[in-house]
Swiss-Prot record:
Keywords: 4Fe-4S, Cytoplasm, Iron, Iron-sulfur, Metal-binding, S-adenosyl-L-methionine, Transferase. CDD domains: Radical_SAM (cd01335). Belongs to the radical SAM superfamily. Lipoyl synthase family. This is Lipoyl synthase. SMART domains: Elp3. It is found in: Cytoplasm.
Length: 320
């Protein structure tokens, strides 16, 4: 009889160490991978002073960016543009989604000084728009909602003219309590990603629930009808176009007005493989459908991510 795997608190488990403990065994690290089409090949710019400045500023304050932790392909572009998505509540997630490159494990307690550190870093960077996200923290009674609220409060106190978007987890089992915590310090944009279609949730988002995520988006909108709600999807994981269109309609039916749609990219051989690469023309068609459905803004393209050019998304600019 094998000995149960025991995680050490504060240790990051990645790649095989992370995906090997997922209940649904659907990853063969030795399988042949799809070849990337030409439209998915980008030339990364050389590291610049601005990129290093952002990285050093975050490390100096003990902060994390989802750009680095999730191995985002747009990191160089966004950092060169002077933007970053801050990841609060540590860099260890209590979930182990096999599409995501963020580390899994037993996280450390939240840093009570993080809200102030975050506010000072944003002030130093002279940002006008910021996205704040987090790992899942199922170990916390409020799932981290109170910490989100404190971060928004601290950032606004030092940066009174800034626009704040929060990209939140699903606050599993604690939606009512979480939204109550956010009432005191609401964001300018509320974002929660559905990620993909409900048929694939068991293998893509173990521990999550499609209807629960819709409920979170709907109930936030009911409390704050004038704050835009936003959600993002990845394509290329085995879903059909018809299923994606149905998810888009579900989002509209629950009051969501902003959409992001991008191509899934496999972080490593130990993550879910890409089932297909969606051509740019299909992303254009998805954007047209989104406009027909009544989304106020839809960013659809191979390299689009939830917080990619979020400032342009919020102002209605074309992002693809």
């Amino acid at each position: 009889m094998s000995t149960p795997f025991k995680m050490e608190r504060g240790v990051k488990y990645r790649d095989a160490a992370k995906t090997s403990i997922i209940p649904v065994k659907n990853i063969d690290p030795n399988q042949e991978l799809l070849k990337k089409p030409e439209w998915m090949k980008i030339k990364l710019p050389a590291s610049s002073a601005k990129i290093e400045s952002i990285k050093n500023g975050m490390r100096r304050h003990g902060l994390h960016s989802v750009c680095e932790e999730a191995s985002c392909p747009n990191l160089h572009e966004c950092f060169n543009h002077g933007t970053a998505t801050f990841m609060i509540l540590g860099a260890i997630c209590t979930r182990r989604c096999p599409f995501c490159d963020v580390a899994h494990g037993k996280p450390l307690p939240p840093d009570p000084e993080e809200p102030q550190k975050l506010a000072e870093t944003i002030q130093d960077m002279k940002l006008k728009y910021v996205v704040i996200t987090s790992v899942d923290r199922d170990d916390l009674p409020d799932r981290g909602a109170g910490h989100f609220s404190e971060c928004v409060k601290a950032v606004r106190e030092l940066n009174p003219n800034i626009k704040i978007e929060i990209l939140v987890p699903d606050f599993r089992g604690r939606i009512t309590q979480a939204l109550e915590k956010l009432k005191d310090n609401p964001p300018d944009v509320f974002n929660h990603n559905l990620e993909n279609v409900p048929r694939l949730y068991k293998e893509i988002r173990p521990g999550a629930d499609y209807e629960w995520s819709l409920k979170l988006l709907r109930e936030f909108k009911e409390i704050f009808p004038n704050i835009p709600t936003k959600s993002g999807l990845m394509v290329g994981l085995g879903e059909t176009n018809e299923e994606i269109l149905q998810v888009m309609q579900d989002l509209r039916d629950n009051g969501v007005t902003m959409l992001t749609l991008g191509q899934y990219l496999q972080p490593s051989r130990h993550h879910l493989p890409v089932a297909r690469y969606v051509p740019p023309t299909e992303f254009d068609e998805f954007r047209d459908k989104a406009n027909e459905m009544g989304f106020e803004h839809a960013a659809c393209g191979p390299f689009v991510r939830s917080s990619y050019h979020a400032d342009l998304q919020a102002s209605g600019g074309l992002v693809k």
